[in-house]
Amino acid sequence: MGSLESEKTVTGYAARDSSGHLSPYTYNLRKKGPEDVIVKVIYCGICHSDLVQMRNEMGMSHYPMVPGHEVVGIVTEIGSEVKKFKVGEHVGVGCIVGSCRSCGNCNQSMEQYCSKRIWTYNDVNHDGTPTQGGFASSMVVDQMFVVRIPENLPLEQAAPLLCAGVTVFSPMKHFAMTEPGKKCGILGLGGVGHLGVKIAKAFGLHVTVISSSDKKKEEAMEVLGADAYLVSKDTEKMMEAAESLDYIMDTIPVAHPLEPYLALLKTNGKLVMLGVVPEPLHFVTPPLILGRRSIAGSFIGGMEETQETLDFCAEKKVSSMIEVVGLDYINTAMERLEKNDVRYRFVVDVAGSELDN
């Protein structure tokens, strides 16, 4: 690894313990290597998994922890061997900042499935230093794990695409869920689900939103552009919709029954799990075997898919519904996120907040 001319100190907002409360934290960036870029953070989206990590709900958290993996910024320095980016370019950093680069997954541009992947925060860099995320003034990132923000994509809009956007884009491409006219269900209308609706519509699919109440029906159809809306508690309507969908993307991040949704699938239909559920899910097999249906999973996307997501959304003018907040509001934003009180994604204006640069 190379070294900086002088050690660079930055300020971020960190959790110190499982309470998850975030407060200012000053720390040193890792030393810049020949293939690294230094990114000044402009915006960073808030993801539900940030809450999970901050509160140690998976039992794997290390503190102090600076969260944030939907990072958009500007390149301020580059290493001696960086060819991909130039100083002054707008770039993004998603959920991972490293991998082994030699396994079967890495060789197929599926770095997110590498067993040696390095998370953007709450992990350890190759040099032994802790990774810290985007709720901070700057980051040092290997150029391989940085993507370019298209010129016609607003920076604040790009942030949610680096996690929520690629989370739905990747399975749609991998499982060939992009044929115009096919019928796709979106289960759950949160940060990931609302982008699922928009991206599916951009591919030309017929989209049905499935939710536990009708509170979001008007917005789902009139604002997001969904074609149909199902209330999962309405037994009669659910029965009428049986065997009507080619596939369902399940974005719910908490335990829930699967049988009611499997029944909505046509023969050979696929239910793709996208939510990180830390509890066991239970289901009986007849809905699967009697329709040759399948349950699959998908996790974010590789670096090529992440760039493709940004380019696709820029071309199709797919935008997120966001609420931009400052770092001084971040704890309130986390509380609201826990209550599902956001339409549909918080984005933190890091550069506009009072932090050392």
Swiss-Prot record:
This is Probable cinnamyl alcohol dehydrogenase. Its EC number is 1.1.1.195. It comes from the Eukaryota. SUPFAM superfamilies: GroES-like, NAD(P)-binding Rossmann-fold domains. Signal peptide: none annotated. Involved in lignin biosynthesis. Catalyzes the final step specific for the production of lignin monomers. Catalyzes the NADPH-dependent reduction of coniferaldehyde, 5-hydroxyconiferaldehyde, sinapaldehyde, 4-coumaraldehyde and caffeyl aldehyde to their respective alcohols. SMART domains: PKS_ER. It catalyses: (E)-cinnamyl alcohol + NADP(+) = (E)-cinnamaldehyde + NADPH + H(+); (E)-coniferol + NADP(+) = (E)-coniferaldehyde + NADPH + H(+); (E)-sinapyl alcohol + NADP(+) = (E)-sinapaldehyde + NADPH + H(+); (E)-4-coumaroyl alcohol + NADP(+) = (E)-4-coumaraldehyde + NADPH + H(+). Keywords: Lignin biosynthesis, Metal-binding, NADP, Oxidoreductase, Zinc. Its cofactor is Zn(2+). Coiled coil: none annotated. Zn(2+) 2 binds at C100, C103, C106, C114. Binds 2 Zn(2+) ions per subunit. GO terms for molecular function: cinnamyl-alcohol dehydrogenase activity; coniferyl-alcohol dehydrogenase activity; zinc ion binding. InterPro entries: ADH-like_C, ADH-like_N, ADH_Zn_CS, CAD-like, GroES-like_sf, NAD(P)-bd_dom_sf, PKS_ER. Pathway: Aromatic compound metabolism; phenylpropanoid biosynthesis.
